[in-house]
């Protein structure tokens, strides 16, 4: 990894936070552990992260609630849901809401690392897409082709209103 990918881990169980933080830090990720869902949502409003890993069952707010909030504000961030109470029904439910993956506790380290790696790759692809899209918009926008003089801007403004 050239630049460390940023991973937010959300779990109300401190032992899992410690294990996940150690595992992912050792794998080269920049990890932010948070044990409160509301704090995590606030953190995401200010910070940029590449991937979120959240527990499903937590006090105050469920992992599904966190997932829904993330998908409303930052739909391109991959979210991995972890739970000790896994079922096919809950896996299908969170996937319908946009979860990237559903991992049951206890987890296999290799499985988790592979899922995180794939989520990071998706996040990077989204970032590259946004950069290319902005570059194309800047390169081929009409004001680049026509000009930036005040007279041309006024003319374009009139055209836009029509």
Named regions from a protein language model:
Residues 35-36, 62-65:
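Acidic catalytic/metal-coordinating carboxylates
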Residues 33-51:
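Acidic, metal-coordinating helix/loop segments flanking the phosphotransfer/catalytic sites
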Residues 11, 55, 83:
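Active-site residues of response regulator receiver
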Residues 58:
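Receiver (REC) domain active-site loop signature in two-component systems and cognate sites
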Residues 97, 105, 148:
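A Lys-centered signature of the CheY-like receiver
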Residues 133-162:
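AAA+ ATPase active-site-proximal loops
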Residues 14-32, 46:
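Two-component/phosphorelay signaling modules centered on CheY-like receiver
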């Amino acid at each position: 990894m050239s630049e460390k990918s940023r991973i937010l881990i959300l779990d109300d169980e401190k032992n899992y936070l410690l294990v996940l933080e150690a595992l992912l830090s050792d794998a080269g990720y920049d990890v932010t552990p948070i044990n409160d869902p509301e704090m995590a949502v606030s953190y995401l409003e200010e910070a940029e992260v590449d991937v979120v890993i959240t527990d499903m069952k937590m006090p105050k707010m469920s992992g599904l609630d966190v997932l829904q909030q993330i998908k409303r504000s930052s739909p391109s961030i991959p979210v991995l849901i972890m739970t000790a109470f896994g079922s096919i029904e809950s896996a299908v439910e969170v996937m319908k809401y946009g979860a990237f993956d559903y991992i049951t506790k206890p987890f296999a380290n290799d499985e988790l690392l592979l899922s995180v790696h794939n989520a990071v790759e998706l996040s990077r692809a989204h970032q590259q897409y946004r950069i290319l899209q902005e570059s194309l918009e800047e390169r081929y926008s009409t004001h680049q082709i026509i000009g930036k003089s005040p007279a041309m801007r006024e003319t374009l403004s009139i055209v836009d209103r029509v």
